[in-house]
Amino acid sequence: MKTKLLLLPIARLLLAIVVCLPVWSSNMFAQTTESYAVLDNAAGTLTFKHDANKPAGAFSMNEDKTFPAWYDGDGTEYNKNNITKVVFDPSFANARPTNCYAWFFACKDLTTIEGLEYLNTEKVTNMNSMFSNCLSLTSLDLSNFKTKM
């Protein structure tokens, strides 16, 4: 009889643990999201993302008046000759960059920018030289940019 009485509370406890487990595990292992860019040299594509899956070799966003990290390793030469296409992944809509200084400066072979609507510019304070000398870029829709004077 005592065994039967103990089974009911134990069963309730186990049920409560199973029901709460997804909540506990999602909070225990929450990952930090971050903004980054990935350069695929073979395809000539620079892709911007904002998530918790930054791969090795991905570039962080630049701060202040410094050139972006997708310059080459020593910071003196740009991967500009490799970039023909820029893609803003839908995840980048959650990013809030504060600086776009020289993001595409002198990318003379850049012809296409996809997903520009996912670039939220409301916190950006510096867009200096963002598209300077993009000689092959023939059109650009900036209607989604939110800027203040």
What are these regions (language model features)?
Residues 1-32:
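Bacterial Sec-dependent N-terminal signal peptides
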Residues 31-149:
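Negatively charged
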